Amino acid sequence: MYHPNMFESHHMFDMTPKSTSDNDLGITGSREDDFETKSGTEVTTENPSGEELQDPSQRPNKKKRYHRHTQRQIQELESFFKECPHPDDKQRKELSRDLNLEPLQVKFWFQNKRTQMKAQSERHENQILKSDNDKLRAENNRYKEALSNATCPNCGGPAAIGEMSFDEQHLRIENARLREEIDRISAIAAKYVGKPLGSSFAPLAIHAPSRSLDLEVGNFGNQTGFVGEMYGTGDILRSVSIPSETDKPIIVELAVAAMEELVRMAQTGDPLWLSTDNSVEILNEEEYFRTFPRGIGPKPLGLRSEASRQSAVVIMNHINLVEILMDVNQWSCVFSGIVSRALTLEVLSTGVAGNYNGALQVMTAEFQVPSPLVPTRENYFVRYCKQHSDGSWAVVDVSLDSLRPSTPILRTRRRPSGCLIQELPNGYSKVTWIEHMEVDDRSVHNMYKPLVQSGLAFGAKRWVATLERQCERLASSMASNIPGDLSVITSPEGRKSMLKLAERMVMSFCSGVGASTAHAWTTMSTTGSDDVRVMTRKSMDDPGRPPGIVLSAATSFWIPVAPKRVFDFLRDENSRKEWDILSNGGMVQEMAHIANGHEPGNCVSLLRVNSGNSSQSNMLILQESCTDASGSYVIYAPVDIVAMNVVLSGGDPDYVALLPSGFAILPDGSVGGGDGNQHQEMVSTTSSGSCGGSLLTVAFQILVDSVPTAKLSLGSVATVNSLIKCTVERIKAAVSCDVGGGA
């Protein structure tokens, strides 16, 4: 369906011969052009073939004569030079006859041209080496300044020399590596000096990384790095300030130590890591503290360790993976189901040599499970990216909470976590992901505790599964060999616009379904059923959302049915009338379809709802369904018919108003590493519960008033509450699992 090389990017020091025009090399109509059009008795410095450089009949004291060639002669000579820079005697004679020139004139012209190309290549090489040298010197000065300003975190006085020895050693190693890189480039450049234009130095030019990988679905995080909508400011993402100058040397030291720990943990097996039944490796905590006695200190009292490791091969180039992880908007976009909000506070280093090698960022982020019953995990950390000597890349996070003693005690701490990325052939990469947290999860709802304590909610398996699915989504969106099946969108522009619209819908849903500290959920307790949480917000001046008062409602419940069965039921348009009250029992037909990988359930669909009492189509629904090893989503939103016609024609999808609703389906954690005892009461009456059930979150968004300044009525809240409860009961009944008030 897609070509495996689609993610191969341009390499910074790729020396592959590349045909380049004169203008690409900086050749313009300057003095050098005038020089190369003169011949006759000029003497050049090049003598690669032992040819004599002067006309033997010319006397040394005789004044030089210059012969300016015609435009036709110059064009013919230039054309021949591109094909053969070193013509033999026979070829020179043929050229002289054709161009009405003396053989010696032709000979000297070619000698001058080769000398000019050699000098130009040397200048190009010198510019590159000078640029690298300047960057190296600037980086060196930055490290020296950080070291000179370092203070002791305990007494506030100047740091002792011995305390900074580790950083100084790292600085020397990094500088030596950069010098070796420059020497290597110099050797390669020297090898190509004097070669034809096809071996030009154009690939050596230093470019800044694009930093904006086109994911075919847009970049919906705003410029500050926040994803989705921001509803509050009294949380860690807003309260944490940028690091002070005295903090920066400590941050650098923490990042370097965390990188070393992450790489060792990624490459070490037993006894540090123990295998589990669900193919995830969990950390042996005793062995960890023996292997890494220093780290970031002992585990705080009251926190529980949670560490896992997972590996996978993904269809994405290693350079693009690094760009996604180091760009807060792309990272939040790809992992929108896990990262509810994220912000880069300060960039301490952008990297060297034009890429992310050595990049250092201070960040805050909020991680979530798609349910209002699971508190989010907020972290203040530094992210460090490094390319290692074997060519692999690593990106590591480590908490900086110790630098903010005035900050309220947090419920989570991030020990060195991140991933090791190794390049594979054909644009693939091997990713080894490590998540190592210390958490206080006592406030998690009992229904979700087995899932959280199994490590499936926030662990490495969920990150890797999400990454695999998103890489497949991107690969499928860029595929050109689309089969012309019924309802399949084959237009590249239409596919791109529809996928972009669908991703905005998914991100909006994910940012509003969890227990983010930015949300002001109100619990509506009712007798004999699940609690429904509601919140309201005003929508104004947003072309992607209808104006007015939006009421959001969400509830989570457990059913003793396998997640795959629930997912297949909810995504199937033929069974939609069994639970969707808004469809009024009408038939639902799929009008358009885009596959997002090899899994049939991963797709974007455009559905048409035919009212039960009319043959006329009166509603369109955009739906994206996605599933992976960690969970599933079915997200949808009503869309305007005229607006969708514009999108399917390749128009801008950002102006299509959406209010997404949908479902998040997670395993209950009672099988494959979870603590099933905590579900004993729920499954005691149902034999199928022993096989593992599903945790289902239902979330609706409804425009209750088109006037943003209007007041919300209690009747609107009651209507939405009734709607969501009726939907829950229909779903339970439809999957033959009506457990009443037992959820």
Curated annotation (Swiss-Prot):
Tissue specificity remark: Specifically expressed in the layer 1 (L1) of shoot meristems.
Keywords for this protein: Coiled coil, Differentiation, DNA-binding, Homeobox, Nucleus, Transcription, Transcription regulation
A Pfam family matched in the record: Homeodomain
GO cellular component, one term: nucleus
InterPro entries from the UniProt entry: GLABRA2/ANL2/PDF2/ATML1-like, HD, Homeobox_CS, Homeodomain-like_sf, START-like_dom_sf, START_lipid-bd_dom
GO molecular function, one term: lipid binding
Residues in START domain copies: 244-476
Predominant place of localization: nucleus
Membership in a protein family: Belongs to the HD-ZIP homeobox family. Class IV subfamily.
Protein's recorded name: Homeobox-leucine zipper protein PROTODERMAL FACTOR 2
Native source organism of the sequence: Arabidopsis thaliana (Mouse-ear cress)
Gene: PDF2
